[in-house]
């Protein structure tokens, strides 16, 4: 027997075919969210308050400091927040200190700074009652970038950019005459030496001594019209502020504020880390030949002689000396923007491949401290030196798509940036108030206006592109949404601008971003998913784990290192499936490995690291596809994406053929209930589980406190599916930390169960499975195999209007008693009622304007002393195509002190309607390999082809769907699934390390089946065997969220667009079907003139004709001739508005009067076809 039995959770054993042992547990899959938010609460907020403190007034007398903060208890708990449509948030209280310097008085106060949304344990936020996810954003990291470009004459040129986290950009470039220019903040360019002079290197000689003589520098100095620091400063000021009178002081303060003011310019810790890495000597001298010795600055001894070529080993030896600033020089810069001395390191090296033996200077930035978040003059000089070195062939250009140059902004940082915006707006208000208020009676509370802070947080959660309504179709969709990485959003790319290179798979994605899971369509490659083992480091770079190789013994150690993409570029990494002996040594002399972008074979001695697992390349969703290695990547992409659209079924079932990821994905998704502590189950019922903690002290175990776990029962998920949790533990069970206590939707016994295992045959049947269509047995309908539960929410609110309050009541004008049969005495539908479209759910009347009374009404009024109530019916009705059973009704009243109602609303009623949807013709089904299709026919069980033992098969798929799509994984799954079913076992075939052909065939033989996996099938209609043996097996098939019930739509009359008077489009607007250009051609080709005329007039925008036609149909008369369509009139008006004289003539050249039909004409005919005229903005967009 191939494979070994592995336990997944408490309830499931699987036969696992993996050959590579797991050396590292999968991390918690949503820690990217939870860790980042924890960092924000612990450090991020504090950092913000530190940055902004102190706020001083213009005279410097008052100073306001933020000392400390704390989060209080949330007003509503999680469940209550969801029920009340509230935000799950805790009050943020900040300790503020006000110092009055004149008197030395200090006032301290705790100030409330708004409610701060809290993250749930499962990595989501509840905002206005709905669960939302903050997606992590992939952005370009702040750093110094150099890139190569070819100009129009085919010459190689370079440009450089210093990109901060916030602040002005600094760019260097060369032109056709080999002059080097600088641009400050995207303005006009200046010769580079102007900026150097402004920094205090004032004479030509100083500049040449600093950067080393080169042709480019000489050309630039010739072009430079300034001669000293003052002139350079004025020149820069004129460029940045044209039209303003330049003075040296103004120029200095402008340059200071652009680059050296920490409030305006911020490299962030990540920018400082990247700049030091790029500009320091230790990374730039690799493989260079020294033109001067390297001297230890402390002892004065020569560490490396002139003429030495520095290879990796040599560099490692002198690393400490380089870091203690060998060959460093300190410049005292006169008249510069910054008064402090500038320290730089410079070493002369020989220009590579130069016959004349010229030298060039390599200047490093002398490693400013990581606390220095601004750019320093040393950074600017070192970046210029790097640029000149590049022109001499020393150094590397950067690849912007490399993950070493792209970083993640997760929840914490995104929130911090948003909070910073709010605080800086608040800072302005505080300053203004300081100058107005009386200093004696002033308190911190009076100075602080928290509105801008609250507004910026609200804006972020409510309307940011990265704050998204959680995709809750099933647990996998939830999990993937939390692990999504988006390159879109504020400060990121836009769809239109994103080039092919940004979207493409890059070698640095290996183990960090999934190369498979990305949307099809305009966002392809811009939205990605985090790989299964990846994690994010403190700087926001994605790291992936590798097993360290001991270089002395050449064996794999137990040490696991997490490497970022640019660290990995220095190492050779062996694949996870390299053969090892029991001591961890490589068995083969030549090992398949990766070095940067190359997959190659190298000697085993060259290996530095080894992959942790074969599935570290792919994301959680992709890792759920068995036999992924046998599928074409395009289909695997569809498979990974479609699993997220699977609808939770009423009776879910875990796959016979899994990958072992099902348990982990279910546990971490947040849909299951997991134990927070080790304990013993004391009580289990359908809606709650009680667990007594077991605490270990001094080696003995004793009972601790009791934990309550409430279960969600038949709730509506964000996607309108049924969210239900079922306990899977029993009283007395001892559960471990993080063990699953209750299954969520689409789960069975602690494993993800998105679909069902069904018996599938690859065969055609009367052409019904043409073009990927699916033929299904009626058994699957009858036995509720693919039945799902859907819950819709409808709400109605009674508001105050100008004419009086709306009222929720059973007393509705002009409605029969039968229409009110489901309403209780309040006028609200009762729970359990069965409703269909058009039925009233909530009776509501709205006051109408008072009209002139008729004689009869006046008489009634005189007799009974009351005016007949003037109200119109605005009841909430079931929309078209909906209906079902009323599951729940929630009523919120203002009288009962419900402060969550929005202003002007007196009463709010929410009605939940549940539908049980069996599977239909027209529903979309798919497997896990991107094999999707629509059900074309549901065949009675007795007519389905049956196996030799008489069992009819469940589904027939077209064999032509396999070869051209190249997703052979489905065929292997089919065979292995049949064997697993016959053996009564579940199997796991992990990605890239699963069952191979031999394993599949041997398992098939073990199950007593024919080795080719084929069988004789008999036609259910005739009882005859089919001509050839057919592949029949068990495949895991899912029902997708694209259901025909949601798409079916019909209209006779309905709303029309306001200007063109054509019917609206789309089901949501109750629109019509657009009869477009090509359809018109079809009728023209047939010569169907009258049909065409009626489609373009009565059925579209002939306003008079359609009213008359409706009348004629009702009265049974002949239909009159059509009149002029409204869109023709719109065209005429359009031309007339351009000043053209447009008239319509008949065949006798008589002008035809184009009378406007107004609403009164239509009203006379007593037929209002325009049930509601929609604004022009809703005009049809569908074709």
Swiss-Prot record:
Residues 1151-1162 have a biased composition (Acidic residues). The RNAP catalytic core consists of 2 alpha, 1 beta, 1 beta' and 1 omega subunit. When a sigma factor is associated with the core the holoenzyme is formed, which can initiate transcription. InterPro entries: DNA-dir_RNA_pol_bsu_external_1, DNA-dir_RNA_pol_su2, DNA-dir_RNAP_su2_dom, DNA-dir_RNAP_su2_hyb_sf, RNA_pol_bsu_bac, RNA_pol_bsu_CS, RNA_pol_bsu_protrusion, RNA_pol_Rpb2_2. GO terms for biological process: DNA-templated transcription. This is DNA-directed RNA polymerase subunit beta. Disulfide bonds: none annotated. Belongs to the RNA polymerase beta chain family. PANTHER family: DNA-DIRECTED RNA POLYMERASE I SUBUNIT 2 (PTHR20856). It catalyses: RNA(n) + a ribonucleoside 5'-triphosphate = RNA(n+1) + diphosphate. Residues 1151-1183 are annotated as: Disordered. One of its GO terms (molecular function) is DNA-directed RNA polymerase activity. DNA-dependent RNA polymerase catalyzes the transcription of DNA into RNA using the four ribonucleoside triphosphates as substrates. One of its GO terms (cellular component) is DNA-directed RNA polymerase complex. It is an enzyme of class 2 (transferase). Its EC number is 2.7.7.6. Gene3D superfamilies: 2.40.50.100, 2.40.50.150, 3.90.1100.10, DNA-directed RNA polymerase, subunit 2, domain 6 (2.40.270.10), RNA polymerase alpha subunit dimerisation domain (3.90.1800.10), RNA polymerase Rpb2, domain 2 (3.90.1110.10). Keywords: DNA-directed RNA polymerase, Nucleotidyltransferase, Transcription, Transferase. The gene is rpoB.
